[in-house]
Amino acid sequence: MKKLYKITPYVMLGLMVAGCTDLDTEPLSSTITSNQKEEVVESDPSRLEASVAAVAANFTQYAKIYTEDDNVHSDIGYPTIMLATESRGTDMVADITGYNWYSNSADYSDCLNTSTATIEFWGTLYNQIFTANNVIGTVDNETEDPTLQYYLAQALAVRAFDYFTLIQLYQFNYKGHESAMGMPLITEQNATEVAANGCARSTVQETYDFILADLNKAIELLTATTKERDDKRYVSLDVAYGIRARVYLAMHNYAEALKDAEAALAKTTATPYSRADVSKPSFINIEDNSWMWGILITEQDRVSTTGICNFPSHMGSLNYGYASVGGWRRISPKLYSEIPASDVRKGWFLNGEGVSANLPAAAQTYITGKKAPAYTQVKYGVLNDQWGTDNNATDIILMRVEEMYLIKAEAQAMSGNVSGGVSTLNSFVTAYRDPSYQCTATTPEAVQEAVWQQRRLEFWGEGMAYFDIMRLNKGVNRLGCGFPTTAVFNITAGDPVQIYSIPNKEVQYNPLLENNPLVSAPTPIPDVESVSYTHLTLPTNSLV
């Protein structure tokens, strides 16, 4: 039987687990209070270090929602949200095959309240929220200890990130939906009550207010502390500003998004990838100057030792995994045709003849031998340029500095400074991606469209595309995008199928929880602008 993840019992489990730690018992095994815990960590902040590391570790772990015996190879943490949501859009194409674990997202059957996708999303994000709550509940909110300020900021920032992700998955965008149902807000203060009685959904407004309160406090703490992060797994001040810039952008509060994007750029040491940097397969190393925040993967991590249950397996074309044996991730030929030849990003994908100018000769030989379809992505590299490697211990992007430039450009234009937005956009693209680029937009909306086009190219495969579709009130028109016949749709903006249903078992267990309207997958339509691919027919979803 599959182990379904539910909020209420997991809250209780979290309380039970917390009760087994050395922070919860005195030497004679008497249970101590929350105030006493705060006193313990104030006297020895190092006792909280492992809990803070666990918050970051929760971003990607294998088989934490299901069990390993269930063999659900998409149960890999936050990266499964990236892959599933990318599969729901218009720009990432893949065959509906047993080797594509995200076929249900591509054909929208993941809209069901029993889908693996919604169970994984809900469980992954609330699991991390509960881990963050354990840290938050152990530190005095007004602590002046630099280490504890830093630890508390980590938990608050990640909790905000998780709730922000949830609200984008389970509800339409903020603007115009402020009174709609948001998320159940589980905190360090109400966890026991939730475990006993369940939790209702807050409104969208209340959810965003909560997210911003966490981020505001995290920024306050990161400004005050003198402790620096050990590596980019953790949230620094520039990253916290970056997360808040995303939130304000989603809220259409462009003036505040602009302030935070500029603050992030002022505080960060990150610099954009140069044209030379991305003229070859890249995007796998957290130490790259462009990365502000990421998921650090080691060869010892379970997602790595599985070999095939990880982001590179499902995404990568140049390494061994599900993608390279039939689940090939490809750019829409329609979007590919819109990339100028002068733009280095055109080489992030094979052309119609299966060739990319960005590939070293050995990599081109490898992928030609694998018979990869036209338009297959070669954006993502492999460890040590070992083409075909089964070592998939590569890092995963959560935030790059390029995003801050594009938020700045959009926010400038949408808050009234159209010429400033155009200037920021032109400066960024010509310096780092396409020296011939020129945006000549004269209205805020036209600049926003131009920025959206750049985001579609720049962050292809990085888990942002579907959230952009939602915040910009776009539909999903796949005509001419090269999708399999069972996944060709023209979904209008606001269609209920665009948001996920809460897992059925969660609603059954939590009497206070109201679900989104239950919907069925849309009916495919004929693709009157169809594009031919070379397809591989592969019958199973198990690699040996």
Enumerate the language-model features and the residues they cover.
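Membrane-proximal, proline-rich intrinsically disordered regions
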Residues: 20-80, 315, 326-327, 335-340, ...
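Conserved, well-structured interaction surfaces
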Residues: 94-170, 202, 219-227, 391-396, ...
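Hydrophobic-face positions in mid-chain alpha helices that act as interaction patches
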Residues: 63, 70, 258-401, 435, ...
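Short, surface-exposed recognition loops and adjoining beta-strand edges that mediate ligand/DNA contacts
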Residues: 29-35, 70-81, 170-179, 183, ...
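Sec-dependent bacterial lipoprotein signal peptides
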Residues: 1-18
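Conserved small/polar residues in nucleotide/adenosyl-binding loops
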Residues: 534-540
